[in-house]
Regions:
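Cofactor-binding active-site loop characterized by glycine-rich and histidine/acidic residues
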Residues: 58-81, 92, 97-234
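Conserved acidic/glycine
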Residues: 1-107, 222-227
Length: 234
């Protein structure tokens, strides 16, 4: 067993990288873990804590990938400094929002894994797609058009990073890479892009059918820049 898995509870409680768990978070998660074990939805306490620790590590790595997607042309998984030519001349991407979305989306995946229930998801911030794509590449949940191009290897992540906001066009005048600036048809799990901040999320109350579950990442985009006739407090 790897050293960081010798004591799953202590491993998770200690956090990882910039991720720190408050006493309140630890208390609530302990109660949740005990309830899930009692309900036989997760095998045992150690398994649950191992999943929690894994979520921290995926989140930390995905946030690094998101930052690289905005500023860099490639990633060095060994941690060596990048050269000046490895940085994009014109950085683009909604980095702040995407960094916030990473732990939210990983938390959604963690909830699915802990409970054995796959939920749908709606993200009000379609422009934060870097978070979704980074996490998907790391865990191997990419779309058919992305399979074989993006993965968690250094080469696969570097292709993801280099393709982001590349505006590459093929000979037919179509996008040459399966990656956009917003959630789109090539984003695994995405089925709709509202085209207006918060438009799709306004329907979240009515979206799931009876017996279905939905996780919604609400956006305050209306306060950010757009207040249209459909504006509503979130």
């Amino acid at each position: 067993m790897p050293p960081h898995q010798a004591n799953p509870l202590a491993d998770w409680q200690s956090g990882y990288g910039p991720i720190v768990h408050r006493a309140e978070t630890i208390e609530r998660m302990q109660a949740l873990v005990q309830r899930l074990v009692t309900q036989m939805r997760v095998a045992d306490v150690a398994t649950a804590h191992a999943l929690l620790s894994a979520a921290d590590r995926v989140s930390c790595t995905a946030m690094s990938v998101v930052a690289h997607m905005t500023y860099a042309r490639r990633i060095d998984r060994s941690g060596n400094p990048l050269e000046p030519e490895d940085f994009k001349r014109t950085p683009e991407g909604h980095t702040g929002g995407s960094l916030n979305m990473v732990p939210a989306f990983v938390g959604y995946l963690l909830a699915n894994a802990l409970t054995g229930t796959t939920r749908g998801w709606v993200m009000g911030q379609g422009h934060c797609v870097a978070a979704i794509e980074a996490v998907n590449a790391l865990i191997g949940d990419v779309s058919a058009t992305q399979r074989g191009r993006y993965d968690r290897s250094e080469a696969g992540l570097s292709r993801l990073i280099g393709d982001f906001y590349s505006y590459a066009i093929d000979e037919q005048g179509r996008p040459a890479v399966p990656l956009g600036s917003h959630a789109g048809p090539n984003t695994a799990g995405a089925i709709s892009e509202g085209g207006y901040l918060g438009l799709a999320e306004l329907q979240y109350v009515h979206t799931p059918l009876p017996g279905e579950s939905l996780v919604t990442f609400l956006s305050d985009g209306a306060f950010e820049e757009q207040r249209g006739s459909d504006w509503a407090p979130r």
